[in-house]
Amino acid sequence: MKGGVGKTTLSTNFCYNIAVREGKKVLLVDMDPQFNATQCFFSGDDYIKYCSEGNDTVVSLFQDEKLKVSTVDGAETATRKEYKDMLPYKYKDNLYIMPGNLNLYKVSMASGGGRDFRLKNYLNVSNKVYQFDYVVIDTPPTPSVWMTSALLASDYYVVPVKPDPLSYTGVDLLRAVIDDKMGDYGHTLKCAGLVMTMVERGTIVYNKALEWVSNDKHWSQYLIKKDILKRTNIPKWQLSNTFINDIEDSDLKLGLSGVVTEIIERIDNYEKVN
């Protein structure tokens, strides 16, 4: 329910880690109209080239039959493809991305007419071809048709929280939104973890946040033991398409690896029970 909590850092590095380190086949879907996750995988020039060649982005999933979209050469009319023809971008072996697009703002925000289920329907079709081990959806921080679509397409959700009062107050609002929205659709989601991000260990702010989560009757059971440390260079690394796995920072990498491992273990345990 709040931006700037390390959501994109967590989602992109989670995908990169399990694809490169674990050899899992992963799809990242960038559902945030600001498409920050996409910019972690593309340079500006490469992204413009990708779009100008008519390749697919999340707009392909949500546009109506005819939609005016902006390109580097001006506005043109696009026709929605069939799901089987919407192809994700292969970043490297095992790692695919359905890029975000600023034009998502131009698609009607109104729900209904099956629009809320388009992402779910697309993933059902796409997974028959690619057989992904995991699909990770990076969502906008506020309630919208895009968040609803992501929730309906998901079995689990992960909550990143920056250790400050505004951020961890927002997790209760997020929980209320998820419960309310999914109740309307009769869809059940499980929380696979609450991850502390941008952490400065030993600070008063961090200790208070950790105490709050540890004592909370609901969220304490979901707290991931490892966390993502604060590094001022992370935005610069992202703009140069560099991931935590490739950085010479053992503490940062160890934290990420622990977060990824625990999230996967939680999901595996849920799957065994069900």
Task: For the regions a language model picked out, list residue spans one by one.
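P-loop NTP-binding core
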Residues: M1-N274
